Every structure is written in C-alpha cells, then in structure tokens.
Regions:
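Short aromatic/hydrophobic "clamp" motif used to bind/position activated sugar donors
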Residues: 36
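Hydrophobic helical membrane-anchoring modules
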Residues: 129-195
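Conserved donor NDP-sugar-binding/catalytic core segment of glycosyltransferases
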Residues: 47-75
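Glycine-rich, basic loop-to-helix element that forms the pyrophosphate-binding segment
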Residues: 14-31
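A recurrent flexible, glycine/aromatic-enriched loop bordering the glycosyltransferase active site
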Residues: 63-71, 83-100
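A short, conserved alpha-helix in the catalytic core of glycosyltransferases
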Residues: 104-109, 114-134, 139
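Acidic donor-binding segment of Leloir-type glycosyltransferases
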Residues: 1-15
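The conserved acidic donor/metal-binding loop of glycosyltransferases
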Residues: 40-46
Length: 195
C-alpha cells in the first residue's frame, strides 16, 4: 500500500536480526539519503510530512518528531497527546516517529543494537543530551491498540515506571527484567480474567 501511495520512492526490502533497535539501525546503514525517518507501523504521519521535515532541517533542527494524537476518544490518551506539543524529554516516545540527519545519527552512535528494550528512548535521550530537540507543530496519528488491549492506566503506569527507573540510574538489564516480570504478570491476569 505504501509503495502504491508513493510510486516515486525507491523502496528497499532488507532482513535484519531480531530486535527493533537492530532492525532500525540496519535500515539506517542501507539508506542513502541525508535524513533518516523512523516510523512505527501503526503510526501515520501528517500529509506532506516530508516537506515539514526538510523545512525543519533547513531551519537548523537536525532531530525532531511530530506532535501525536491517539486514534481514541479516551480522555487520558487525549491528555497524553496534548502534552506532546512540548519539547520536554518526558513527552517523547517512539510512536511520535523520529527524524534525524544521518550525520547526527552517526555522531551519536545510532540505535543501540545490544539492548532488547527501550531503544527509542535510548536514542532520544542521547539526542537531548547532545542539544536541542524540535517538535514539528503538526499532528501524527497513532493506534491506541496496545492501550485498549492492556488497559490505559495500567500501560501508562508501566511506561511511567520504566521512565523513572531509567532516570534514577537503572540499567537496561534491570529495566528489561522489570519488563519481563510485568509482561508475565499481565499475561497471567489476562488469562485469569478470560477463564
């Protein structure tokens, strides 16, 4: 569908090792453009997104994302989306998509291919540590499927916990251990509620 919508694009299909960080890094290595754009499969950028990105780069913004709206009328998700207009580090996430010049991507080391979780946040934190981070004032839409399946407040509490664990010095291994325990507990609760 994407190829039909953008026939002028030169698309490459590439297989990489398991893990989102490894896969996105592999894509960056075969890309031949000056700007990299990472987009989750269930996120939909605004019309003319490429023009907004090129304009932002020309104005001296080597890395940024779009504002985000969930495809849901849940009041909490509306609030979360509203806060993505701010350039605060805590308001960032992979669902907002990520553009970065290839030069800056290489300079900060790109996606960490060794970590099994938190790859988007890891890259975003290094971008913030490097300098300013720009939010394009246009709206991207993203699926609320995971929130609907797991529960809005339960999933948001999980994200907040991981964020604060990392901010307080937790290692990726500690965060991953928490993630595995949380997933196991969530699956058990889901199974018991269905019985």
């Amino acid at each position: 569908a994407f190829a039909k919508a953008y026939p002028s694009l030169s698309l490459k299909f590439h297989t990489a090792s398991k893990g989102r960080g490894s896969q996105m890094h592999a894509g960056s290595q075969i890309a031949n453009g000056e700007i990299l754009y990472f987009l989750h499969a269930d996120s939909f950028p605004p019309q003319d997104y490429d023009k907004y990105i090129i304009q932002a780069v020309s104005q001296g913004n080597p890395a940024c994302c779009f504002r985000m709206r969930f495809m849901s009328w849940n009041w909490w998700l509306i609030i979360i989306g509203w806060f993505t207009r701010f350039s605060w580090r805590a308001s960032r996430g992979g669902d907002q998509s990520q553009y970065i010049t290839k030069e800056l991507y290489e300079k900060i080391g790109g996606y960490n291919t060794e970590i099994p979780i938190y790859e988007d946040y890891d890259l975003i934190h290094r971008l913030y540590d490097h300098g300013t981070y720009y939010v394009i004032p246009k709206w991207l839409k993203t699926s609320a499927r995971r929130y609907e399946e797991i529960g809005v407040y339960k999933l948001q509490w999980f994200y907040i916990t991981i964020y604060w664990k990392k901010r307080n010095g937790a290692t990726i291994d500690e965060i991953y251990e928490y993630y595995l325990k949380w997933c196991q507990t969530s699956q058990l609760q889901k199974s018991s509620s269905q019985n």
